[in-house]
Structures are given as C-alpha cells and as structure tokens.
C-alpha cells in the first residue's frame, strides 16, 4: 500500500493521518499527527480463537521519553513499566473500543500506541484514541467502529474542546468523552463541584465534537480500508441450549432471586454443578466432550444473564429485592483504628471499604517525571482489592490496571475539596482497603475517604459521596438502577459512577457494554445519582457533622516561616550541612520551597519551636533602632566588635561606648563581655554600627561646680576637629627676657 496522507483541522489544530508508510505488517497501522504530537498506532489480531470465556483485548499506551526530549529516569536510563498516567490512558482507550467487537469474538487483539513526539498543547492521548479506532477500522479486524474521543474543559462559563495546557489549568472541568456517531459510550471526569446541567451540556457538546472526528475517520476508511476477515465466533449448540433451558431454567430462576449474595451464589452454583454433572456423565466418551462442556457452561451463564435482566425489566424486581432507585443499607464509622492519622469505615450492603489517612511533610510528595515537565504530587489515593473481599483465592502482588484506575477515580473525586497548600501544608495519602465487595467498591472507597479526612482534621471544603448507577436496556425500554451490586454490574449494560458534594459533581466515570447511551438516559441517571448522593451524605454527616478542629495526636505538627529567597542557601548550608545539623539537633523534618516557605514538622511542639528559633536566627537581619544583648568578640583601638546574633556582628566605636571620654577600649569592655547595644546605622554594604551609650542616660552638662561657681575647665568648641586647648605658661617666654 502506497503512503497516503489525510488532513483536517480540529479544535484549532492540524490533524494529519498517514497510512501505508510504517508498520505495514500489522493488520492496520496509522501515524496520527495532532499539532506537534505524533502517535504511531498498530493493531494486530491472532489467527485463531483464544481459549477462555472472555475477549482478550490488550491496549497499550507507550510513552517514549525521547518524544519530549528527555532521558528516562533511574539507573538504567531506559523506559520500564508504564507510568500511572500511561496505564490510565490505556484504560481510557480500551473502554470505548471494547464494546465495538461482536459478542462471541475470541481472537486476541492488541492495539499498541507509541508516542513518538509530544506537544503539551495538543493531546497525545486523544490522538492515540483516534489512531486506535482508525487502525482497527482500516484493518481486516472485525471492528464495528469507528469511535473517537475528545477532552472537554469549562473556562469562564464556556465549554472548550481539547483545551490547551494553559486553559486546562484554569478549567473547572477535566472531562474525556468518547462514543460512536450515534451515542456516548465512555466518560471519565474530574470537576470542581459542577452542576448536573453543566456536566450534561459538556457531555453533549463533547459528543458533537466526537461526530466530527468520526466523519473524518469514515472518509479515510472509505479510501484505504481493508475487507474484514471472516472469523469464528463463539456460539453454543442450539439443541443443547433448548434442552437445558427446558429442564433447569425454573431452578435457576429461584436461585437468582435469593436476596443475600453468598447464599445466592451458593444456590446458583448448586444448579450449575447439578447440570454439569449430568452432562459430564452423558457425554463422557464423546469425541467433542470439551466443546460440549464449554457450551454447557456458556448456556448456564446466558440463562442467569437473561433471568437477572428479565426480573428487572419486566417484574421491576432486583435480585436482592430492592426497588430500582433504592440504596442498600448504609453504615459509617470513624476512628476505626488507633494510632493512625485518621480512619473511616464505610459499608453499603455487602460492600465495605476502610480508608486510612496519613499526613506527612511536603518532602514526601510524589515526583512525577513523565512527558510533561516534572512536578510534585501532593495528594495520593490508593485502592487495594484483596481477593478475600469476594471470598476467593487469587493473585497478590503489584496493583493491576483496575486498582490503579479505581484509585485515580477516588483521587479525582476527593482532590476537588482538599484545602490549598497554604491552608494545609501537608502531603496527604489515603489508602482504601476493600474488605468486602458486592459492587460499587470504588464509590465506597470515596465515602470512606471522606470519613477519614474529616476524622483526621483535614479541612476539606465539603464531604464527598459516590454512587454507582446501572442500566438494563432491552430494545426501546430501559431501566436505570441506583447503587448496583455485583450481579447487576456483571449482567447489566452500564456502570456509571457519580461522586460529588451537595453543591455539585466532582468525578464521573462511565463504562458500557452496549454501543452507546442517549442524552435521555444520561439525564435520568444523573438525576437519580444526585438523590442517592444526598442520602449517603446524610449518613456521613450524621456520623461526623464537621471536620475535627485538630489533627490526631500522632500526626506530625507543623509550623511555617517565610524567609527571603536569598537566605535559603544560608539555612541549607554548604552541601546541606546547616539544615542537617538543625534536623539532627531537634529531630524535626524541614521542607523549603523555591519561594522561601519553610515548613517544620514534628510530633513534638517543643522541637518545632527550637528549630524555628534556630532558623529565624540564621536569617535574622539587624534593624536600625533595635536593641540587642551582644557579646564582645574582638577589640581594636578604635572600638569593639560585638556579635548581635549568629553570624551578624556590629562595630561599637570607642566614641559610642560611654558618655565620658575614654582613651582605651579595654577600660570599658573585654572579650567575652555581654553588653546591651542599639543599632544606629547600617550602610549600603550591610556594615552595622551600634552604640552602648545610646542606652545610657545622658549626664547633665557640667556648667557649675558644687559651690555654684562657674567651672574654669575650658570648653571644647563643637564641630572643630583640630581644636587644641590653649597652653598655660608658668614660665616667662624667652622673648621677654
């Protein structure tokens, strides 16, 4: 295929697509240039159907540091495991693509996005999402696209598509919306307490922009697209399916309607085990035994899926007996753990999350060194999902993509209400431990996080609560569900998570299994979520009505002082010698930023006070008219040098030592003496003159002696430097002889 170039303008930037030049052995590949960001996307498909009961789709987003003209960090100086941002971007691309493959498609598909050049004002993630859809669409891989995505901002009351970095910093909204030309199928957002109306407007305007990108893709597919390959889809034997449904559907229906999760799982598993045993015996010697048993398992899964959906859409009954807009029983607890800086335990039905707060000096912030300029991350929210939370055994190790994604969602939801660094100069870490799970564990972690922050004395602007909404859609009819449990998530069509305060939304996340949802469904889901959010906030506020006024006794206390920027090097000292000495002497932790803000941390207030005193002394400046208790450190003929404080000395001239005349400095002071002095002058070079006599009472002028007679002592005329007293002669001058 010869190289072809397609070009348009989108959101004020050039969008160029090149095909037929690179990565030609992949099923489909494109180079997308958006502004000065360049992304290569290659899509490949395995030749055979994979084993397993899921579609093996892998989407990667690979950040090459050379794209931003940077060296990778670390000893190896080579890219290693994906960054958190890269992992989140890969998930962002995976989620709108996954629903666009046919039911039963089991061939492995990999979509690899490589960032080759990076322009911080032209979104590389959105270029990668565009490239992923286009590479699949022009390939022979059976993909029912195209899809596209855009970023949406909200600045000065205006919706902005693909905002620049400067606009993004000012924006009250950080939204990514993706979909087909007919409907939205993925949402990811953080927001500064925006209303449902503004969020809906942003979603719909974002979708209008998505349609533009899809039209451009369709033009390219028409020009260079390949014919789609014929692949085998997983299907079950129709006669076997009819036989099992007729014999066991009523048993499975009863099992599905058991309200308690573990009892329901046991009941449904008992039916499945019974059916499996029957057919294992029946087809034990059949040459296609493995295929038949795979079909039996798939048929039973389909039967359970169909019954759950029928109950909700036709009978308006949920598996646990709730109404469609009813929340499971709620419980909130603070101070679940001693010694920690704050803790909250939140339970919703059989979903339970424990959140633990840790406060630390700003030196503990996370340094993020990716394609963007390096920055420090002050707030971290980590989410852990152990297998025991669902009563199973399984893998333990580093967090997977799901845990990273759920942690990031909670982080966005809670970050919007955190105090500023000036108000609360701490690094903040929340860890959510999911102790039980039956759906919506990420939203439980947000609620538990609010409890931990409030109990720990972090002055958040308002409590945040989260709720997960579901959808069962059957043709033209649909049912929106409040607070979905695991079964409804598994067999439903949508998982729409909404978090926020009473004043507005702080985070959204939507994943769907169908190809899109309408504005009508979005509106209804947002309205139901708001009602549910307020119910949860009632429970949180009843448990802890307001943020505690003080930090936990075990949390590090903090004091701050401001120093001149040019004094920072004095506090740090050569090679950190001075600051290390202060830390060793007092046991505190000290952080100094580039603006001269010094933060001192310790659990011991006396230690903080001592460190603060030392630092204040190091950067202290003498001021005219201030009085100091000084120590004589050097004596010269013309005066004495005294140490005012630390490394600041002043000269007390001999004439400023006393009101009476003296010829020798040593007659008044010796080295080591402590004297009170007053600063009388600081010249342009910073040299300080001080006076002792300025603090002494001025003696009266000696105009008369004790008898009241006028003194005969000659007066020294003022302002005559060379004046000498007249000499009194006692002998007759020689000239008179």
UniProtKB/Swiss-Prot annotation:
Compositional bias segments (type: Basic and acidic residues): 700-737
Stretches the record annotates as Disordered: 691-737
Domain S1 motif: 625-693
UniProt keyword Cytoplasm present: yes
Example of a GO cellular component annotation carried by this entry: cytosol
Cofactor (UniProt): Mg(2+)
GO MF assignments: 3'-5'-RNA exonuclease activity; magnesium ion binding; polyribonucleotide nucleotidyltransferase activity; RNA binding
Keyword annotations from UniProtKB, A to Z: Cytoplasm, Magnesium, Metal-binding, Nucleotidyltransferase, RNA-binding, Transferase
Leading EC class: transferase
Recorded catalytic activity of this chain's protein: RNA(n+1) + phosphate = RNA(n) + a ribonucleoside 5'-diphosphate
GO biological process: mRNA catabolic process; RNA catabolic process; RNA processing
Annotated organism of origin: Streptococcus pneumoniae (strain ATCC BAA-255 / R6)
Compartment(s) of residence: Cytoplasm
Residue positions binding Mg(2+): 489, 495
InterPro entries documented for this protein: ExoRNase_PH_dom1, ExoRNase_PH_dom2, ExoRNase_PH_dom2_sf, KH_dom, KH_dom_type_1, KH_dom_type_1_sf, NA-bd_OB-fold, PNPase
Residue stretches making up the KH domain: 556-615
Domain of life: Bacteria
Enzyme Commission code: 2.7.7.8
Stated family: Belongs to the polyribonucleotide nucleotidyltransferase family.
Function of the molecule: Involved in mRNA degradation. Catalyzes the phosphorolysis of single-stranded polyribonucleotides processively in the 3'- to 5'-direction.
Source lineage: Bacteria, Bacillati, Bacillota, Bacilli, Lactobacillales
UniProt-recorded name of the protein: Polyribonucleotide nucleotidyltransferase
Annotated SMART domains: KH, S1
């Amino acid at each position: 295929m010869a190289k072809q170039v397609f070009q348009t303008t989108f959101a004020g930037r050039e969008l160029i697509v090149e095909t037929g030049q690179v990565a030609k052995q992949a099923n489909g590949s494109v180079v997308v240039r958006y502004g000065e960001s360049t992304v290569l996307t290659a899509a490949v498909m395995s030749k055979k159907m994979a084993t397993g009961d899921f579609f093996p789709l892998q989407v990667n987003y690979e950040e090459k540091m050379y794209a931003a003209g940077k060296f990778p960090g670390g000893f190896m100086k080579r890219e290693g495991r994906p960054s958190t941002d890269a992992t989140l971007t890969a998930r962002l691309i995976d989620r709108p693509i996954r629903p666009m493959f046919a039911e039963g498609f089991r061939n492995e598909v990999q979509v690899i996005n490589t960032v080759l050049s990076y322009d911080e004002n032209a979104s590389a993630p959105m270029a990668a999402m565009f490239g992923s859809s286009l590479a699949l669409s022009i390939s022979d891989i059976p993909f029912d696209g195209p899809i596209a995505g855009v970023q949406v901002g909200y600045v000065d009351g205006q919706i902005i598509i693909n905002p620049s970095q400067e606009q993004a910093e000012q924006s009250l909204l950080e939204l990514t919306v993706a979909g087909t030309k007919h409907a939205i199928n993925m949402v990811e957002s953080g927001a500064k307490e925006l209303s449902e109306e503004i969020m809906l407007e942003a979603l719909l305007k974002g979708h209008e922009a998505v349609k533009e990108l899809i039209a451009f893709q369709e033009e390219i597919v028409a020009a260079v697209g390949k014919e789609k390959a014929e692949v085998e889809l997983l299907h079950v034997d129709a006669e076997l399916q009819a036989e099992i449904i007729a014999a066991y559907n009523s048993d499975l229906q009863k099992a599905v309607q058991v309200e308690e999760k573990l009892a329901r799982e046991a009941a449904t598993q008992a039916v499945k085990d019974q059916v499996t045993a029957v057919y294992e015996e029946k087809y034990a010697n059949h040459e296609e035994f493995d295929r038949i048993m795979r079909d039996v398992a798939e048929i039973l899964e389909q039967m359970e899926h169909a019954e759950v959906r029928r109950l909700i859409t036709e009978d308006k009954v949920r598996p646990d007996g709730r109404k469609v807009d009813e929340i499971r029983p709620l419980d909130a607890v603070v101070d679940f753990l001693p010694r920690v800086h704050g803790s909250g335990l939140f339970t919703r039905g059989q979903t339970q999350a424990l959140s633990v707060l840790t406060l630390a000096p700003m030196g503990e912030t996370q340094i993020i060194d990716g394609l963007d300029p390096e920055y420090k991350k002050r707030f971290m929210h980590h989410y852990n999902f152990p297998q025991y939370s669902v009563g199973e055994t399984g893998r333990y190790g580093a967090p997977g993509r799901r845990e990273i994604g759920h942690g990031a969602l909670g982080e966005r939801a809670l970050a919007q209400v955190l105090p500023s660094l000036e108000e609360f100069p701490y690094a903040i870490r929340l860890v959510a431990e999911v102790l039980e799970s039956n759906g919506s564990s990420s939203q439980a972690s947000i609620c538990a996080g609010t409890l931990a922050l409030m109990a720990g004395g972090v002055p958040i602007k308002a409590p945040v609560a989260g709720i997960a909404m579901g959808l069962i859609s059957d043709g033209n009819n649909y049912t929106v569900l409040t607070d979905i449990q695991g079964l409804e998530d598994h067999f439903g069509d949508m998982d729409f998570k909404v978090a926020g305060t009473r004043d507005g939304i702080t985070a959204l996340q939507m994943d769907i299994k169908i190809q899109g949802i309408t504005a009508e469904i979005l509106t209804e889901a947002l309205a139901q979520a708001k009602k549910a959010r307020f119910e949860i906030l009632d429970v949180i506020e009843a448990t802890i009505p307001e943020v505690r006024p003080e930090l936990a006794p075990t949390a590090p206390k903090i004091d701050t002082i401001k120093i001149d920027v040019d004094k920072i090097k004095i506090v740090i000292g050569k090679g950190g010698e001075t600051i290390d000495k202060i830390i060793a002497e007092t046991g505190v932790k000290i952080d100094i930023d580039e603006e001269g803000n010094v933060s001192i941390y310790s659990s011991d207030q006396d230690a903080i006070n001592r460190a603060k005193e030392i630092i204040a002394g190091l950067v202290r400046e003498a001021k005219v008219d201030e009085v100091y208790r000084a120590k004589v450190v050097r004596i010269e003929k013309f005066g004495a040098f005294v140490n005012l404080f630390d490394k600041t000395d002043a000269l007390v001239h001999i004439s400023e030592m006393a009101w009476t005349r003296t010829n020798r400095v040593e007659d008044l002071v010796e080295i080591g003496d402590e004297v009170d002095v007053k600063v009388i002058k600081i010249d342009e070079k910073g040299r300080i003159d001080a006076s002792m006599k300025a603090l002494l009472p001025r003696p009266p002028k000696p105009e008369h002696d004790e008898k009241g007679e006028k003194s005969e002592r000659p007066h020294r005329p003022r302002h005559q430097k060379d004046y000498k007293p007249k000499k009194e002669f006692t002998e007759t001058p020689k000239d008179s002889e």
